Amino acid sequence: MNFFTMCMLAAGFGMAIGAFGTGIGQGLAVKSAVEGVSRNPGASGKILTTMMIGLAMIESLAIYVLVVCLIILFANPYKDVAIKALETVAK
């Protein structure tokens, strides 16, 4: 397995796990907000505001994972070192 294949697998698995985690987190946040509004409709404004801030923070995880995956794929600072190490191991 060469270096670029490993980078593709790492980026793919990283993005999948990050998307799964943020999806679960956002689902639980919205579920709790809907339950809160159904119990106390008068507080829907505060609940909605808090939920939106929470969703933005949860979504930032997916953005960070995307940035790390793009760095792994296109701007990997250890590319030359890893390629030399893999060539040495292959010999």
Swiss-Prot record:
Principal subcellular localization: membrane
Which sequence ranges form a coiled-coil region, renumbered to this chain?
A: none
One of the record's GO molecular function terms: proton-transporting ATP synthase activity, rotational mechanism
Q: List, alphabetically, the Pfam families matched.
A: ATP-synt_C
Is Transmembrane among this UniProt entry's keywords?
yes
| Residues spanning the membrane | 4-24, 53-73
Q: How does it sit in the membrane?
A: Multi-pass membrane protein
Q: Where is this site: Reversibly protonated during proton transport?
A: E59
Any one of the GO CC terms:
proton-transporting ATP synthase complex
- UniProt entry keywords in alphabetical sequence: ATP synthesis, Cell inner membrane, Cell membrane, CF(0), Hydrogen ion transport, Ion transport, Lipid-binding, Membrane, Transmembrane, Transmembrane helix, Transport
| InterPro entries, sorted | ATP_synth_csu_bac/chlpt, ATP_synth_F0_csu, ATP_synth_F0_csu_DDCD_BS, ATPase_proteolipid_c-like_dom, F/V-ATP_Csub_sf
- Kindly indicate whether the keyword rRNA processing belongs to this entry: no
Its localization reads: Cell inner membrane
Please name the CDD domains in this protein's record: ATP-synt_Fo_c
The entry assigns this protein to a family as follows: Belongs to the ATPase C chain family.
Q: Subunit arrangement?
A: F-type ATPases have 2 components, F(1) - the catalytic core - and F(0) - the membrane proton channel. F(1) has five subunits: alpha(3), beta(3), gamma(1), delta(1), epsilon(1). F(0) has three main subunits: a(1), b(2) and c(10-14). The alpha and beta chains form an alternating ring which encloses part of the gamma chain. F(1) is attached to F(0) by a central stalk formed by the gamma and epsilon chains, while a peripheral stalk is formed by the delta and b chains.
Q: What is the protein's known function?
A: F(1)F(0) ATP synthase produces ATP from ADP in the presence of a proton or sodium gradient. F-type ATPases consist of two structural domains, F(1) containing the extramembraneous catalytic core and F(0) containing the membrane proton channel, linked together by a central stalk and a peripheral stalk. During catalysis, ATP synthesis in the catalytic domain of F(1) is coupled via a rotary mechanism of the central stalk subunits to proton translocation. Key component of the F(0) channel; it plays a direct role in translocation across the membrane. A homomeric c-ring of between 10-14 subunits forms the central stalk rotor element with the F(1) delta and epsilon subunits.
Q: Which PANTHER family match?
A: ATP SYNTHASE LIPID-BINDING PROTEIN, MITOCHONDRIAL, ATPASE PROTEIN 9
Q: Give the protein's recorded name.
A: ATP synthase subunit c
